[in-house]
Amino acid sequence: PDLLLDHLFVHFYFGAVLPMNVPQETASPPENISGIRQLTGFWLWVPRVATVVMTLITIDYLFNLQLIGFITQVESQFFYMVVALMLPLVYVLWPMNKHASRTQVPWYDVLLFLATAGICGFFVYNAEQILDRGWEYEAPQYAMVVSFMLWATIVEAVRRAGGLPIAIIVGIASLYPIFADLVPGPIQGFPSSPTQTAIYHAMSRESIMGIPLQAFANLVIGFL
């Protein structure tokens, strides 16, 4: 999932900011490269605005300007904000399947876009509580439900952007903590419940918020 976010930002940055300087006759249609939709009107500006907002937030975070400290003061909150700005766009840019429209955003993708934005927004809003109250180990019931929802939306986003085989690999790998006691010796471990696994994926620094996302948010965006 973290590598997916890396791919998305590079696409948004170079697809939303730089094409204005590229001659039309030399630019390849995006759908021929990655199967994305040809957005028009309002939806065309959604990834562009998200890219600009992420750039400004990253500048504030990397240079410790504290101009928008309510987002960048807590590191995990900044990471959740990166996810919140990128993950929902998958449902706008990548169709559900090959038969779906490549020029219009259907109603179900609009709902998924809004739902994913709301799910990610929940973690942005509660990032400080997650740290202070140790939700990674004992989260309230409603946070457990939202953790399952984030888990599901990420696997579906991987399927759309990376294909079904990669989604299957990611999905099976994400279930590992549940069956850790059943795998061969070298990778065997103590099992976790599905609820603990969902919380682990959503709130720990070892899964969605792991090293790939941290390196991406701290280094890759700044470099670009």
Which residue ranges define each predicted feature?
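Hydrophobic transmembrane alpha-helices of multi-pass solute/ion transporters
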Residues: 70-75, 100-105, 131-224
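Short linear sequence motifs
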Residues: 2-7, 54, 73, 84, ...
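N-terminal amphipathic/basic-hydrophobic helices that include classical n-h-c signal peptides
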Residues: 1-19
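Conserved, well-structured core domains of diverse proteins
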Residues: 15-138, 144-148
